[in-house]
């Protein structure tokens, strides 16, 4: 989840703040301890008394993930929880942030009203945002700087199956950019690497380096973390893309 992105950023020596909702339970306490151990500021984690902390159990065999069991409560956050999150983020924006990462897993935190307020704050303070999307309704991401779908997620958004070819990816991305207020689509393409399509028409392709992979869990989080770190540091898109792809 978002905590994995936060941990990746912290391991890159980035000062990280994390916001979200956890339950008042043992797993929630463990989450807070893990965040503390990575030096991540968790003051934005709202503790809910009527929601359990999302927990995932991975079943591995021969170094590969065979299946995953999720234990979770899926529903929109309460109004009070939303207000706490936005107040926390507003305070940070006033102090100064270099970037905002939004990890949407469709669990109820990234609802339309919260995202609208996040993008309004980010644009007001000129802070770049990068979104890891969920689902086919991307109108809620209008105002984002970057969005990082994989081929399957991009296919879901345009409503038809896309083959993993440069021209097909570019065509689909341009279709999305024409109907959504998003500046860049960063398409992660497995063995084909990463492609970036900008609203102004610029296109970058960076092929992947072939290597044996036993578990791709978290690969998208790695791309999000590296891209945000590089771009927030002022590196060019081409260099950021090269570094993120190599990670």
Model-predicted regions and their roles:
Residues 45-51, 58-95:
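Conserved phosphate-binding/catalytic loop of the ribokinase/pfkB sugar-kinase fold
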Residues 92-109:
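Short acidic, glycine-rich surface-loop motifs adjacent to enzyme active sites
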Residues 180-183, 209-247:
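Conserved post-catalytic alpha-helical subdomain immediately downstream of the catalytic base
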Residues 101-102, 118, 129-131, 137-140, ...:
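Extended, hydrophobic alpha-helical segments in both membrane/secreted and soluble proteins
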Residues 17-21, 44, 99-101, 130, ...:
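A structural signal for isolated positions on well-ordered beta-strands in alpha/beta enzyme cores
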Residues 1-55:
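Substrate-binding N-lobe of the ribokinase-like
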Residues 107-203:
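Conserved phosphate/ATP/ADP-binding segment of small-molecule kinases
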